[in-house]
Amino acid sequence: MASSEQEILAGLAEIVNEETGLPTDSVQLDKSFTDDLDIDSLSMMTIVTQAEDKFSVTIPDDEVKNLVTVGDAVTYIAGAQA
């Protein structure tokens, strides 16, 4: 079953919180993973792997570089679930 964008955002916020300790309310659609949330490439790969498991999607390694903002990730996951 496909998740709504709000459900995906909430799920990603939980994953980011678990990985980085950032408050879930700081994970917003317009936030950059690297510039705003200070997530490095290793943490990003962990977040991607957890998101794949949580949302039952596959995010190819070469697609991860295109997930600049939280909104990019939400849009990608929503599209992959459709």
Curated annotation (Swiss-Prot):
A UniProt-annotated Pfam family:
PP-binding
Q: Which GO terms describe its biological process?
A: lipid A biosynthetic process
Keywords per UniProt: Cytoplasm, Fatty acid biosynthesis, Fatty acid metabolism, Lipid biosynthesis, Lipid metabolism, Phosphopantetheine, Phosphoprotein
- PTM details? 4'-phosphopantetheine is transferred from CoA to a specific serine of apo-ACP by AcpS. This modification is essential for activity because fatty acids are bound in thioester linkage to the sulfhydryl of the prosthetic group.
State the source organism's domain of life: Bacteria
Question: Carrier domain: which residues?
Answer: 3-81
Residues where O-(pantetheine 4'-phosphoryl)serine is found: 41
S-S pairs: none
A GO-annotated cellular component: cytosol
A single Gene Ontology MF term assigned here is: acyl carrier activity
Function description: Carrier of the growing fatty acid chain in fatty acid biosynthesis.
| NCBIfam families listed in its UniProt record | PRK00982.1-1, PRK00982.1-4
Protein's name according to its UniProt entry: Acyl carrier protein
**Quick one: which gene encodes this?**
acpP
